[in-house]
Regions:
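Extracytoplasmic metal-acquisition and chelation regions
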Residues: 2-7, 11-18, 25, 29-249
Length: 249
Protein backbone atom coordinates (compact mmCIF):
# COMPACT_ATOMS: atom_id res chain seq x y z
CA UNK A 1 0.00 0.00 0.00
CA UNK A 2 1.52 3.34 -1.07
CA UNK A 3 -0.30 6.33 0.38
CA UNK A 4 2.75 8.49 1.19
CA UNK A 5 2.39 10.34 -2.11
CA UNK A 6 3.35 13.96 -2.60
CA UNK A 7 0.62 16.54 -3.14
CA UNK A 8 2.32 17.42 -6.44
CA UNK A 9 1.70 13.91 -7.77
CA UNK A 10 -2.00 14.04 -6.97
CA UNK A 11 -2.37 17.41 -8.66
CA UNK A 12 -0.88 15.84 -11.79
CA UNK A 13 -4.14 13.89 -11.97
CA UNK A 14 -5.78 16.93 -13.52
CA UNK A 15 -3.16 17.12 -16.25
CA UNK A 16 -3.90 13.58 -17.39
CA UNK A 17 -7.68 13.53 -17.36
CA UNK A 18 -8.01 13.99 -21.11
CA UNK A 19 -6.50 10.58 -21.84
CA UNK A 20 -8.88 8.07 -23.44
CA UNK A 21 -10.55 5.30 -21.48
CA UNK A 22 -9.49 1.70 -21.96
CA UNK A 23 -11.83 -0.17 -24.31
CA UNK A 24 -11.31 -3.71 -23.04
CA UNK A 25 -13.11 -4.45 -19.78
CA UNK A 26 -12.34 -7.55 -17.68
CA UNK A 27 -15.34 -9.68 -16.75
CA UNK A 28 -15.00 -9.00 -13.00
CA UNK A 29 -13.25 -6.34 -10.91
CA UNK A 30 -10.00 -7.27 -9.19
CA UNK A 31 -10.25 -8.39 -5.57
CA UNK A 32 -8.92 -5.87 -3.07
CA UNK A 33 -5.85 -7.00 -1.14
CA UNK A 34 -5.20 -3.69 0.65
CA UNK A 35 -7.24 -1.53 2.98
CA UNK A 36 -10.05 0.30 1.13
CA UNK A 37 -9.40 3.92 0.26
CA UNK A 38 -11.16 6.23 2.72
CA UNK A 39 -12.85 8.96 0.65
CA UNK A 40 -14.79 11.98 1.87
CA UNK A 41 -16.80 13.87 -0.77
CA UNK A 42 -18.82 17.04 -0.51
CA UNK A 43 -21.85 16.50 -2.75
CA UNK A 44 -23.97 13.48 -3.51
CA UNK A 45 -22.96 13.57 -7.18
CA UNK A 46 -19.26 13.39 -6.39
CA UNK A 47 -19.85 10.79 -3.69
CA UNK A 48 -21.93 8.61 -6.01
CA UNK A 49 -19.21 8.70 -8.68
CA UNK A 50 -16.57 7.78 -6.10
CA UNK A 51 -18.65 4.81 -4.91
CA UNK A 52 -19.13 3.54 -8.44
CA UNK A 53 -15.45 3.93 -9.24
CA UNK A 54 -14.12 2.57 -5.96
CA UNK A 55 -16.55 -0.31 -5.47
CA UNK A 56 -15.30 -2.59 -2.70
CA UNK A 57 -11.97 -0.81 -2.76
CA UNK A 58 -13.29 2.45 -1.31
CA UNK A 59 -15.31 3.66 1.66
CA UNK A 60 -17.06 6.88 0.70
CA UNK A 61 -18.73 9.46 2.93
CA UNK A 62 -20.71 12.37 1.47
CA UNK A 63 -21.00 15.50 3.61
CA UNK A 64 -24.17 16.85 1.98
CA UNK A 65 -27.36 14.84 1.94
CA UNK A 66 -30.35 15.14 -0.43
CA UNK A 67 -31.85 18.62 -0.60
CA UNK A 68 -28.80 20.40 0.78
CA UNK A 69 -27.77 23.53 -1.13
CA UNK A 70 -24.03 23.25 -1.90
CA UNK A 71 -23.83 26.99 -2.67
CA UNK A 72 -24.73 27.85 0.93
CA UNK A 73 -23.27 24.88 2.83
CA UNK A 74 -20.54 25.47 5.42
CA UNK A 75 -18.33 22.82 6.96
CA UNK A 76 -19.13 21.65 10.48
CA UNK A 77 -16.75 20.33 13.12
CA UNK A 78 -17.90 16.81 12.25
CA UNK A 79 -17.15 17.48 8.60
CA UNK A 80 -13.64 18.71 9.39
CA UNK A 81 -12.98 15.56 11.40
CA UNK A 82 -14.14 13.34 8.52
CA UNK A 83 -12.06 15.33 6.03
CA UNK A 84 -8.98 15.07 8.25
CA UNK A 85 -9.28 11.30 8.44
CA UNK A 86 -9.78 10.77 4.70
CA UNK A 87 -7.15 9.34 2.36
CA UNK A 88 -8.72 11.41 -0.41
CA UNK A 89 -10.96 14.48 -0.22
CA UNK A 90 -13.19 15.15 -3.22
CA UNK A 91 -15.01 18.41 -3.77
CA UNK A 92 -16.73 19.70 -6.86
CA UNK A 93 -14.98 23.02 -7.36
CA UNK A 94 -15.82 25.77 -9.87
CA UNK A 95 -17.29 27.68 -6.94
CA UNK A 96 -20.18 25.25 -6.43
CA UNK A 97 -19.32 25.00 -2.72
CA UNK A 98 -18.98 28.79 -2.56
CA UNK A 99 -18.83 29.05 1.24
CA UNK A 100 -16.12 26.37 1.47
CA UNK A 101 -13.89 27.54 -1.39
CA UNK A 102 -11.23 29.13 0.80
CA UNK A 103 -11.30 26.23 3.24
CA UNK A 104 -10.58 23.64 0.56
CA UNK A 105 -7.87 25.71 -1.13
CA UNK A 106 -6.05 25.87 2.19
CA UNK A 107 -6.83 22.28 3.10
CA UNK A 108 -5.15 21.12 -0.13
CA UNK A 109 -1.77 22.46 0.95
CA UNK A 110 -0.84 19.28 2.80
CA UNK A 111 -3.60 16.77 1.99
CA UNK A 112 -4.86 14.77 -0.98
CA UNK A 113 -7.63 17.03 -2.27
CA UNK A 114 -9.21 17.02 -5.73
CA UNK A 115 -11.65 19.56 -7.20
CA UNK A 116 -13.11 17.07 -9.66
CA UNK A 117 -15.10 19.43 -11.88
CA UNK A 118 -12.02 21.55 -12.50
CA UNK A 119 -10.69 18.70 -14.63
CA UNK A 120 -13.08 19.83 -17.38
CA UNK A 121 -11.17 21.88 -20.00
CA UNK A 122 -12.03 25.56 -19.73
CA UNK A 123 -13.15 25.70 -23.37
CA UNK A 124 -15.96 23.31 -22.44
CA UNK A 125 -17.14 25.43 -19.50
CA UNK A 126 -19.85 28.09 -19.66
CA UNK A 127 -18.86 31.56 -18.49
CA UNK A 128 -21.50 33.73 -16.85
CA UNK A 129 -21.83 37.50 -17.15
CA UNK A 130 -23.01 37.88 -13.55
CA UNK A 131 -19.90 36.19 -12.12
CA UNK A 132 -16.75 37.61 -13.71
CA UNK A 133 -13.92 35.09 -13.94
CA UNK A 134 -16.08 32.17 -12.85
CA UNK A 135 -17.83 29.37 -14.72
CA UNK A 136 -21.17 27.63 -14.40
CA UNK A 137 -20.32 24.70 -12.08
CA UNK A 138 -23.26 22.40 -12.91
CA UNK A 139 -21.28 20.16 -15.28
CA UNK A 140 -22.99 16.93 -14.18
CA UNK A 141 -25.97 18.00 -16.28
CA UNK A 142 -24.01 17.00 -19.39
CA UNK A 143 -22.62 13.44 -19.43
CA UNK A 144 -19.87 14.35 -21.90
CA UNK A 145 -18.47 16.94 -19.50
CA UNK A 146 -19.06 14.79 -16.42
CA UNK A 147 -16.70 12.20 -17.94
CA UNK A 148 -13.74 14.47 -17.19
CA UNK A 149 -14.61 14.62 -13.49
CA UNK A 150 -15.12 10.85 -13.32
CA UNK A 151 -11.74 10.17 -14.89
CA UNK A 152 -10.07 12.64 -12.54
CA UNK A 153 -11.55 10.82 -9.53
CA UNK A 154 -10.40 7.48 -10.93
CA UNK A 155 -6.86 8.74 -11.48
CA UNK A 156 -6.68 10.26 -8.00
CA UNK A 157 -7.69 6.93 -6.45
CA UNK A 158 -5.11 5.08 -8.55
CA UNK A 159 -2.40 7.53 -7.45
CA UNK A 160 -3.25 6.84 -3.83
CA UNK A 161 -3.51 3.05 -4.21
CA UNK A 162 -1.95 1.75 -7.47
CA UNK A 163 -2.67 -1.82 -6.39
CA UNK A 164 -6.36 -1.19 -7.10
CA UNK A 165 -5.70 0.13 -10.60
CA UNK A 166 -7.31 -2.74 -12.54
CA UNK A 167 -10.48 -2.73 -10.45
CA UNK A 168 -10.78 1.05 -10.49
CA UNK A 169 -10.40 1.23 -14.27
CA UNK A 170 -12.89 -1.60 -14.78
CA UNK A 171 -15.47 0.00 -12.48
CA UNK A 172 -14.99 3.36 -14.18
CA UNK A 173 -15.48 1.92 -17.66
CA UNK A 174 -18.71 0.23 -16.57
CA UNK A 175 -19.97 3.39 -14.91
CA UNK A 176 -19.23 5.52 -17.98
CA UNK A 177 -20.84 2.93 -20.26
CA UNK A 178 -24.05 3.18 -18.21
CA UNK A 179 -23.95 6.97 -18.36
CA UNK A 180 -23.48 6.89 -22.14
CA UNK A 181 -26.42 4.51 -22.50
CA UNK A 182 -28.73 6.74 -20.46
CA UNK A 183 -27.56 9.83 -22.36
CA UNK A 184 -28.25 8.15 -25.69
CA UNK A 185 -31.75 7.23 -24.52
CA UNK A 186 -32.35 10.80 -23.31
CA UNK A 187 -31.30 12.27 -26.66
CA UNK A 188 -33.68 9.92 -28.46
CA UNK A 189 -36.65 10.77 -26.22
CA UNK A 190 -36.02 14.52 -25.99
CA UNK A 191 -35.65 14.78 -29.76
CA UNK A 192 -39.38 14.02 -30.01
CA UNK A 193 -40.20 17.39 -28.38
CA UNK A 194 -41.06 19.95 -31.11
CA UNK A 195 -38.18 22.39 -31.62
CA UNK A 196 -40.26 25.47 -30.77
CA UNK A 197 -41.27 23.88 -27.45
CA UNK A 198 -37.74 22.97 -26.34
CA UNK A 199 -37.74 25.55 -23.59
CA UNK A 200 -36.87 24.62 -20.01
CA UNK A 201 -37.77 27.07 -17.24
CA UNK A 202 -36.30 26.30 -13.82
CA UNK A 203 -36.21 28.05 -10.46
CA UNK A 204 -32.40 27.82 -10.28
CA UNK A 205 -30.39 28.38 -13.46
CA UNK A 206 -28.53 25.06 -13.19
CA UNK A 207 -29.43 23.39 -16.48
CA UNK A 208 -27.35 25.23 -19.09
CA UNK A 209 -25.11 22.23 -19.74
CA UNK A 210 -28.23 20.08 -20.09
CA UNK A 211 -29.55 22.54 -22.65
CA UNK A 212 -26.35 22.36 -24.69
CA UNK A 213 -26.28 18.57 -24.55
CA UNK A 214 -29.90 18.00 -25.55
CA UNK A 215 -30.86 21.04 -27.60
CA UNK A 216 -33.01 22.97 -25.10
CA UNK A 217 -33.18 26.68 -24.43
CA UNK A 218 -32.85 27.08 -20.67
CA UNK A 219 -34.20 30.01 -18.66
CA UNK A 220 -33.70 30.25 -14.91
CA UNK A 221 -35.82 32.34 -12.58
CA UNK A 222 -32.76 32.70 -10.35
CA UNK A 223 -29.17 32.92 -11.55
CA UNK A 224 -26.54 30.16 -11.41
CA UNK A 225 -26.25 30.75 -7.66
CA UNK A 226 -29.21 30.18 -5.34
CA UNK A 227 -28.24 33.40 -3.55
CA UNK A 228 -29.71 35.51 -6.38
CA UNK A 229 -33.32 36.71 -6.31
CA UNK A 230 -36.01 36.79 -8.99
CA UNK A 231 -38.24 39.83 -9.53
CA UNK A 232 -41.96 39.78 -10.33
CA UNK A 233 -41.32 41.36 -13.73
CA UNK A 234 -39.04 38.49 -14.72
CA UNK A 235 -41.55 35.88 -13.60
CA UNK A 236 -44.31 37.61 -15.56
CA UNK A 237 -42.11 37.72 -18.67
CA UNK A 238 -41.37 34.00 -18.36
CA UNK A 239 -45.08 33.20 -18.11
CA UNK A 240 -45.71 35.15 -21.31
CA UNK A 241 -42.87 33.29 -23.03
CA UNK A 242 -44.28 29.90 -22.03
CA UNK A 243 -47.71 30.82 -23.37
CA UNK A 244 -46.26 32.19 -26.60
CA UNK A 245 -44.18 29.06 -27.23
CA UNK A 246 -46.99 26.71 -26.12
CA UNK A 247 -44.67 24.92 -23.73
CA UNK A 248 -46.32 22.20 -21.69
CA UNK A 249 -45.73 21.68 -18.00
Amino acid sequence: MNRSLSRRRLLQTLAGTTAGLAIAMPATPAVATSHPINVTATTGMIGDAARRIGGKNARVKSLMGPGVDPHAYRQTRTDILALSRADLVLWHGLYLEAQMEGFFRGFAEDRFVLAAAEAVPTDLLIAHDDYSGKFDPHIWMDPERWVYAVRAIRDAMINIEPEFSTALRTNTDRYLAEIAQVSSYAKHVLATVPAEQRLLVTAHDAFNYFGLAYGFEVVGIQGISTESEAGLNRISALVDLLVQRKVRA
